[in-house]
């Protein structure tokens, strides 16, 4: 996955879109008819100038965003996390929001309205996480991904010596940034937030100490090596001290992680323009969980007749990939790509490849994720990272953490073909630079999760019962995330109750269940996997009904992916005409019941 939404490169929102209104210029007074078009063209041009200014402002306020996008003049720089710096970010975003909101519907053509609403969406999402969520003052996840130096270490965008210089600049900036973060956190903190922070900052300290020096050991610049040595020692101390400070807060930890119903609903609207009532959203999630559990029972009746669902899933999980998860994933990628080509499912717009590697110690909070070069980079590899089990776990838990081959097939589908990697191949070729830069949480994760079920339906892996179980365990994981997010933040659910649901309803091993339940507290938007998937499924159903044909599925996928990454309701308005609205798919029987 692309990371926690509050710190990801993606901004995740969209304003309502009023298109497809079918009103036309009057047929009389033909001589004056071109005037509105001329005015719209002028305002569209002004809007695009404002968009260019917004992008440049984003680079200035969020230099890690810029560097990850491929603007390497920002290499090594970190944001200003001081209270004054956060206020300056918020003030700038509010001013930008006012600027774009001033472009009225009557001043813009359809394309201009879409672009304006997409920009307003990004701004609203940033403002929610920055101001309304309270996360800058409680949640280490607001910061930890921003601090990742992976780009300098793993992305060959420049010679190693140049990347080392950027990394040294980053290391030199790190102690100040960490001091600002520590100053922002208001005690006491929720227990799961503390654990995340301890693991993240402790992971950074370990990585800086044990792994980074060897990466740059061959660079022969003595002065640069001296700077590296000094800044490396300071970075190790700063990250280790931060982990120790957070660990010292554990006796005072709280369980005050819930956003509350009002703020959670605001999050859904501000970040995804989903305005459905929470009870309706919960019912849809429960329906999808029930659908997938029924499908799992049917598959298990063939794969492990007479066994319980848990025993059936355990049998699938026991068939481990040869050589471990990373080697297994590497073997799957070429097969998945060829399957997409053979089945003509979606266009592959380029020859780029993704490689599978073990995740670094500082970023192992989820089993798998992918790092993809930004739109300003050219001809660089993407890396599909897989986290090993926590060495502090029991041997049994460590072994259980590695998925079976069938389940891993759909992790690889999610992360690479045709999930995140393919989606970003399309996004990086979007006709509008803004769409290349800003890809939303529900769009990205919804597409990747949608891709899993779509690939099974197309027959990947022979669509055997074992393969179906692999797909369904991934789907059940996301269903329980969806329900946990709602429960943890609006329904009084405890972390222990969420963990039990992951084990009993999604059949997760103990280690994954612990990770996933904790993640729900500090990543409340992780319902976006299932929510995004169900919005895409409903849009596909509606679009293909209006555009039938033998290649309709591929045409749908290509058009959906062409927009970059707006909130899906906004894409729905573009593809179907009419207003932007959130519509989630439910199985036909369930839909009738609702």
Regions found by a protein language model. Give the residues of each.
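Bacterial N-terminal signal peptides that target proteins for export
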Residues: 1-9
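Core hydrophobic alpha-helical transmembrane segments of single-pass membrane proteins
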Residues: 11-15
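C-terminal motif of bacterial Sec signal peptides marking the signal peptidase cleavage site
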Residues: 17-20
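N-terminal maturation segment of proteins
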Residues: 22-594
């Amino acid at each position: 996955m692309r990371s926690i939404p509050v710190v990801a490169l993606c901004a995740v929102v969209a304003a309502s879109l009023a298109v497809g209104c079918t009103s036309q210029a009057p047929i009389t007074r033909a001589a004056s008819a071109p005037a509105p078009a001329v005015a719209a063209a002028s305002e569209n041009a002004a809007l695009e100038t404002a968009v260019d200014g917004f992008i440049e402002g984003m680079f200035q306020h969020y230099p890690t965003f810029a560097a990850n996008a491929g603007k390497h003049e920002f290499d090594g720089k970190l944001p200003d996390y001081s209270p004054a710096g956060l206020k300056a970010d918020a003030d700038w975003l509010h001013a930008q929001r006012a600027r774009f909101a001033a472009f009225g519907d009557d001043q813009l053509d359809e394309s201009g309205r879409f672009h304006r609403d997409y920009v307003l969406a990004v701004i609203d999402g940033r403002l929610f996480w920055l101001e309304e969520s309270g996360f800058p003052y409680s949640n280490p996840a607001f910061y930890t991904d921003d601090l990742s130096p992976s780009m300098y270490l793993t992305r060959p965008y420049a010679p190693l010596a140049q990347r080392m210089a950027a990394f040294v600049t980053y290391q030199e900036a790190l102690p100040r940034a960490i001091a600002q973060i520590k100053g922002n956190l208001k005690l006491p903190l929720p227990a799961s937030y503390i654990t995340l922070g301890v693991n993240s900052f402790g992971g950074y300290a370990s990585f800086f100490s044990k792994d980074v020096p060897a990466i740059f050991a061959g660079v022969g610049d003595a002065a640069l090596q001296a700077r590296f040595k000094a800044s490396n020692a300071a970075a190790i101390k700063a990250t280790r001290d931060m982990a120790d400070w957070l660990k010292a807060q554990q006796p005072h930890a709280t369980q005050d992680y819930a956003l509350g119903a009002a703020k959670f609903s605001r999050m859904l609207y501000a970040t995804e323009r989903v305005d459905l009532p929470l009870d309706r959203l919960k019912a849809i999630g429960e329906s999808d969980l029930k659908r997938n559990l029924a499908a799992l029972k049917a598959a298990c009746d063939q794969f492990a007749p007479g066994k319980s669902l848990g025993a059936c899933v355990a049998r699938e999980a026991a068939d481990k990939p040869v050589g471990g998860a990373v080697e297994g994933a590497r073997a799957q990628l070429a097969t998945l790509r060829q399957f997409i080509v053979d089945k003509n499912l979606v266009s592959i717009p380029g020859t780029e490849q993704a490689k599978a590697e073990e995740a670094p110690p500082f970023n192992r909070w989820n089993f798998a994720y992918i790092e993809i070069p930004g739109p300003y980079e050219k001809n660089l590899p993407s890396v599909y990272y897989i986290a090993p089990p926590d060495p502090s776990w029991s041997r049994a838990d460590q072994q259980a953490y590695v998925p079976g081959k069938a389940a891993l097939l759909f992790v690889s589908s999610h992360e690479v073909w045709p999930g995140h990697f393919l989606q970003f191949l399309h996004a990086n070729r979007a006709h509008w630079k803004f769409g290349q830069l800003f890809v939303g949480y529900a769009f990205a994760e919804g597409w990747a999760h949608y891709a899993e079920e779509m690939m099974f339906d197309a027959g990947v892996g022979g669509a055997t019962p074992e393969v179906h179980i692999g797909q369904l365990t991934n789907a059940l994981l996301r269903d329980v995330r969806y329900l946990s997010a709602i429960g943890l933040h609006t329904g009084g659910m405890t972390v222990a109750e969420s963990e039990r649901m992951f084990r009993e309803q999604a059949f997760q091993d103990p280690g994954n269940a612990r990770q996933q339940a904790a993640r729900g507290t500090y990543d409340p938007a992780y319902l976006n996997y299932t929510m995004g998937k169900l919005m895409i499924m409903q849009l596909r159903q509606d679009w293909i009904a209006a555009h039938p044909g033998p290649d309709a599925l591929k045409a749908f996928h290509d058009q959906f992916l062409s927009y970059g990454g707006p909130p899906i309701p906004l894409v729905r308005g573009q593809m179907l005409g009419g207003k932007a609205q959130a519509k989630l798919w439910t199985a036909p029987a369930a839909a009738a019941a609702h």
